[in-house]
């Protein structure tokens, strides 16, 4: 587990700078542009500004359905896991917001050093360009998981209390569970569920809650495709299911979709096809956990749903800030 650490400058900034924005309805375009500018430099914003930004994000996300309806063209991105400088590399190769429409398939946080900056930047971009930045929920957008895999600890280090973590986890509950592009490409973080035959069944789930330990909502965020598997199998993850080619074919036919696009699993080549190109895994965290040596990928779908993959490597060392190895806060928090 790669625990997040903060540099002294960011810690001081987060605790000392006075906020400039009030309630979410007063969060102006200027405020959002200022937040985006700071976060693009991997600098923290003040705690009160986090609260306001999260409230604004919840307002926007609350208006979106469980299955986000998205028009092409769009660029699909897999797991990011707090690898901020690699997210900057993704935007470099994929194009800046709002020039490019993005759909991120969840797992924004945990394991990487900069989950706070990564998630807040994506939220600020969502608040500023709500129709250009689409975010759905991954299995790591969970209170329980983030207390184990780094995001909670990072919030405590960088802000000195759990308030920012609480604000962010409240946003998690409002994230959509899936998306469908032009009615033909079904997108989800993990995979399918034996409890779900149609997208309409996803649309009626009460998503505004912590990720359950089992059931359809859990399955969407945790399941994996399994080559050679027939029907459904128990997942070694302890949540969700393994689903085979037959389950994928049945779902696609019932919902008139051509492709199931998901993330959730490390792919050394950045993307991987399953089941005669009915299911696709996209992975967007290069050199995962700063040691796996994998490349990353994003998938661009044009107006006709033609596919173009862009492969990219981890950001060069000179482009990334080195987090402090042992911040003094470690001894006191």
Curated annotation (Swiss-Prot):
Principal location listed in the UniProt entry: cytoplasm
Post-translational modification comment from the UniProt entry: Methylation at the C-terminal Leu-333 is critical for interactions with regulatory subunits.
Binding site for Mn(2+) 2: 107, 139, 189, 264
Note describing how the cofactor binds: Binds 2 manganese ions per subunit.
Active site, renumbered: 140 (proton donor)
Cofactor dependency: Mn(2+)
Residues binding Mn(2+) 1, per UniProt: 79, 81, 107
InterPro entries: Calcineurin-like_PHP_ApaH, Metallo-depent_PP-like, PPA2-like, Ser/Thr-sp_prot-phosphatase
Localization annotation: Cytoplasm; Cytoplasm, Cytoskeleton, Microtubule organizing center, Centrosome
Enzyme superclass (EC): hydrolase
Chain intervals with Polar residues compositional bias: 7-27
Reactions this protein catalyses: O-phospho-L-seryl-[protein] + H2O = L-seryl-[protein] + phosphate; O-phospho-L-threonyl-[protein] + H2O = L-threonyl-[protein] + phosphate
Region ranges (Disordered): 1-29
Keywords: Cell cycle, Cell division, Cytoplasm, Cytoskeleton, Hydrolase, Manganese, Meiosis, Metal-binding, Methylation, Mitosis, Protein phosphatase
Job description of the protein: Protein phosphatase which plays an essential role in meiosis and in early embryonic mitosis. During spermatocyte meiosis and the first embryonic mitosis, regulates centrosome maturation, and thus spindle formation, by recruiting some of the components of the pericentriolar material (PCM). During oocyte meiosis I, regulates meiotic chromosome dynamics including synapsis-independent chromosome pairing, restriction of synapsis to homologous chromosomes, programmed DNA double-strand break initiation and crossover formation resulting in chiasma formation.
Similarity comment: Belongs to the PPP phosphatase family. PP-4 (PP-X) subfamily.
Identification of the protein by name: Serine/threonine-protein phosphatase 4 catalytic subunit 1
Organism: Caenorhabditis briggsae
């Amino acid at each position: 587990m790669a625990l997040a650490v903060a540099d002294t400058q960011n810690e001081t900034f987060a605790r000392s700078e006075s906020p400039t924005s009030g309630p979410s309805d007063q969060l102006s375009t200027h405020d959002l542009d200022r937040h985006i500018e700071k976060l693009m430099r991997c600098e923290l914003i003040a705690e009160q500004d986090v609260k306001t930004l999260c409230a604004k994000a919840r307002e926007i996300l609350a208006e979106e359905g469980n299955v986000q309806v998205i028009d092409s063209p769009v660029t699909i991105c897999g797991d990011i896991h707090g690898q901020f400088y690699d997210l900057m590399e993704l935007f470099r190769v994929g194009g800046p917001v709002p020039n490019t429409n993005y759909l991120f398939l969840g797992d924004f946080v945990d394991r990487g050093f900069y989950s706070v900056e990564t998630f807040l930047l994506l939220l600020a971009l969502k608040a500023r360009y709500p129709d250009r930045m689409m975010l759905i929920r991954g299995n790591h957008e969970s209170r329980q998981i983030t207390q184990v895999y780094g995001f909670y600890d990072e919030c405590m280090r960088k802000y000195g209390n759990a308030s920012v973590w609480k604000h962010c986890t409240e946003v998690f509950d409002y994230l959509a569970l899936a998306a469908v592009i032009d009615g033909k490409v079904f997108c989800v973080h993990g995979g399918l569920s034996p409890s779900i035959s149609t997208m309409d069944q996803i649309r009626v789930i009460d998503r505004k809650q912590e990720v359950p330990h089992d059931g359809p909502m859990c399955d969407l965020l945790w399941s994996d495709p399994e080559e050679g598997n027939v029907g459904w199998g128990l997942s070694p993850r302890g949540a969700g299911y393994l689903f085979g080619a037959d389950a994928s074919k049945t779902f696609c036919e019932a919902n008139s979709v051509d492709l199931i696009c998901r993330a959730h699993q490390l792919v050394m080549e950045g993307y991987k096809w399953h089941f005669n190109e009915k299911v696709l895994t996209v992975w967007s965290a290069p050199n995962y956990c700063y040691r796996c040596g994998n490349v990353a990928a994003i998938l661009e779908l044009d107006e006709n749903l033609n596919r173009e993959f862009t492969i990219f490597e981890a950001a060069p060392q000179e482009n990334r800030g080195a987090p402090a190895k042992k911040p003094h806060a470690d001894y006191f928090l």
